[in-house]
Amino acid sequence: PIYIDESKIIVGGCSNGGFMTMRLLFNNPKYFSAAYPVCEPYTDKFITDEMINRIKDIPMWFTLAINDSVVEPMINELPTFQRLAKAGAKDIHMSVFSNVKDTSGLYKDANGQPYEYNGHWSWIYTLNNECQENGLQLFEWAGSKVNNK
């Protein structure tokens, strides 16, 4: 048999998966121990104060690139994060990158500099476990969360 520790269910997704991450949180706020929405397009103006209050106690780590031309951070993740903080969220984090560049050393542009990807591809940093805040890494942080609700 397969056993799932229901106190350690983490949800995350990139782009539309980030939208679905937020939707799952809004609809099931007591189910998840942590969440990591990446370049999520759940436009903040469609998020009510009641929705913010419903999810403010869920540990969350947002990731985005400022130059994302697909999902504009100024109308999506940034105001949502600010509203969560204002509502009293205690365990929220955000990794903000100016752009998305290759960090593997494998891909270079014509000038030999790290290749710059589309700014929407900030999941590259997430999936390479390069999202950090004060020595804390996203996946170590997420794995340490336990849902006692």
Where are these regions (language model features)?
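Short, proline-enriched alpha-helix->beta-strand connector loops that line the catalytic pocket
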Residues: 54-60
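A conserved short beta-strand
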Residues: 30-42
